[in-house]
Amino acid sequence: MDKLNICFVSLTFAPDAQDGAAKFFTGIYNYFKNQGHNVKVITGKWNKEILDPDILQIEIIRRRFFWFPQFNLHTIKYLMKNEFDIIHGNSPKGVLPIILANKKQFISTIHDLGPFETTFTRIPIEKLLIKYAVNKSTYITTCSEFIRREIKYYIPKVAINKIFNLYSAIEDKYKPLPKEAQKLKEELNIRGPILLYIGRIAKYKGVSDIIKAYQIAKKEIPELNLVMGGKPDFYMENTYQEWKQKYKDIYFAGFISEKEIPAYYSMGDIFVTYSYASEGFGLTPIEAIACGTPVICSSMVAYREVLKDHAILVPPRKPKQLAEEIINLLKNDSKRQMLIEKAQEFVKRYTWDEVGKKLEVLYQKFINNK
């Protein structure tokens, strides 16, 4: 295809942020740059500076909703001054400034429909923003067939033929690192098997159920450790600080850098992720599997679609059942090894080349129909 001028608008972007949406846009940014396209990114600055002249990081107030005026005003101004062949927004928060800049044709990515699926979202504007972004988008991409169908279910007026599933992908750096894992374990002064969670500390992530399951499993396996990586969201900040005081036997790692994450995955004997809502793909379990760590996760539709039989699936909000699966897997070395070996070929399908090629087809379709 001809070389394109592309602009990605994404509130978060890796390695400054570690959420799946941020990693997705970093992955496609790298792919299209490597293909020789002129690609720009507009994003917020949350944790660290990204030293790339093609990535514009906007200084924002790092609190819920306080980022809104700064990010939107700077993005609108930038989009009104510059012309692009493709403008692609990451989630409704990335799409809104595109619409406000009066850009009539653009592509959006919807990763999940959390505000429709959960009861903890008390602000109806989040649902309205998703509907607004979906209805205004020329085309929409998702990371699973489940989310593609969910968009049509919750927003019936949208044409299903403008929604495209790309899945997601992982980087080559996610591979077993036994030496680095052992060194990390020694640095953290951890002895015994490790139950690992890496992700946002959010209510819908089922983190409290993971802690309950760990406490149950620890009665059967006293040497068991729980390592939790990730930062709390706005709603969970106070609870997270209380946990750190209450659970002295749990290692709360906080924000883990991109460079360190593969070693953490490799250090775990089991990776657990236990969301009960708002998951469109499930990137962290794929990364963990690639690092040679077996996975236990909730039996949400997106996880069943993406992981299939390459993880142990447990119904959400059942910490006792989760604990039983943790105990059984830790006591069954052959089953752990079987899960690891069986999944190695499976994870190879999730590459940025595969995602990028699908997106190239959609971009060409977009250009042809402008």
Mark where each language-model region is.
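Short alpha-helical donor nucleotide-sugar binding micro-motif in glycosyltransferases
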Residues: 134, 255-256, 263-268, 283
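Short His-centered aromatic/hydrophobic patch
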Residues: 89-94, 110
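Nucleotide-activated donor-binding/catalytic signature segment of Leloir-type glycosyltransferases, i.e.
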Residues: 238-259
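Short hydrophobic beta-strand element within catalytic cores of glycosyltransferases
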Residues: 294-297
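Conserved donor-binding/catalytic core segment of Leloir-type glycosyltransferases
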Residues: 7, 141, 189-205, 211-214, ...
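Glycosyltransferase donor-sugar binding loop
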Residues: 45-47, 170, 198, 225-238, ...
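A short, active-site helix/loop in glycosyltransferases that binds the activated sugar's phosphate group
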Residues: 135-162, 170-172
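Conserved acidic donor-binding segment of nucleotide-sugar-dependent glycosyltransferases
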Residues: 312-319, 328-334
